[in-house]
Amino acid sequence: MKIWTALRNAAKGWVLLLRGDAGWREQFTRSAAGLATALAIFIFVVFLAVIIVAIGTDIPGLFAILAGMFALSLPLVSMALVLAGTRMALGVAGPTYDVLVPGTYALMGFIVVEGLLASLFGGPIVVVSWLALGYLLYRLARAATGWHTGISIGFAVLTVLLLVAMRQALYMLSSIAGSPS
């Protein structure tokens, strides 16, 4: 099955990337089709995460499912925005598929790990998943783009900060919208 092959290759690719092996690129389909596959799997993982959270409660409506999927998709949005901003600031036309495809698979793992940590241990321990995500994004930026250490660290830190800021803004907006006036 193509989905399982893509996930297995992504896991192999990330292991190779973290080891510093140059063969990590061959494990990912770094093209529009590869990005479409990664996004389809990402959407499925996000949908499953929303449904799993709702198992202990009532069946959510369509709007609640879509809102949950939107909130869980913020890591992907933040990575894409920071990548575009970094490329624009540097004035380079670097390899976007080299970052977006492996990054999408890493964010799938992040969503799963963050959800497990939040449900098992509570809020403050979730910071560990943010730190792990930052490290993965740093290593990805170094390997995929050849950016200097400082730029790669900046990319990773800005992506995680934007993710946290967007979630906080969404939380504040939802509490304002839900409060009686």
Give the ranges of each region predicted by the language model.
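Short, charged low-complexity intrinsically disordered segments located at boundaries
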Residues: 40-49, 114-118, 170-172
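Low-complexity, flexible helical/coil segments
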Residues: 52-54, 121, 178
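Residue-level signal for alpha-helical context at structural boundaries
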Residues: 32, 36, 57, 61, ...
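Selected alpha-helical membrane-embedding segments in polytopic membrane proteins
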Residues: 2-95
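A short, structure-level motif marking secondary-structure boundaries and short turns
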Residues: 67-68, 122-124, 167, 180
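Juxtamembrane boundary at the C-terminal end of a transmembrane helix
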Residues: 165-181
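Hydrophobic alpha-helical transmembrane segments and adjacent short intramembrane/lumenal linkers
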Residues: 83-162, 168
